[in-house]
Amino acid sequence: LVTYEAPAPEPVHMQTEEVVMPEAPLSAADLYLEAPRFVGLENYSEYEIEMLTRVTYAEAGNQSEYGQRLVVDTILNRVDSERFAGDDILSIITAKNQFDCVTTGAIYCYPEWDSVRWLVIEELCDRTNSDVIAFRTSRYHSWATPAFKEGDHYFSI
């Protein structure tokens, strides 16, 4: 019987560096601004991103990612449209009787979910649909042109 003795492993030499943490945590928007695909995000405040995330989750948290993106696009398209009062995210979101979660105050009961926040930030930089302006769960709005149904929502243009 032949036996073989393995050589002793070489000692591992680790080089260590001191990690310097920033004084204040960076916001998600600050981190995303460093990536080229998030060009344009600097046009939105942290509060606008938070509120858009909250409305998206409250209105479409149980829908597909695509359905959630369409809700974000609905709000952004209203900002760009002359058909709606308001020319920024907050004025569109808080307009009277436009979003149930704002009208009832439920927007403040939902946490700000990271997965939806990522999606909101991506949509702020590159929209999925630039035509949708309205949605509801039971049927199409009578004042807009029916377009398609995604999940539980009927979207109009």
Tell where the protein language model's regions lie, with residue ranges.
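Bacterial extracytoplasmic/cell-wall-associated proteins, especially those involved in peptidoglycan
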Residues: 22-157
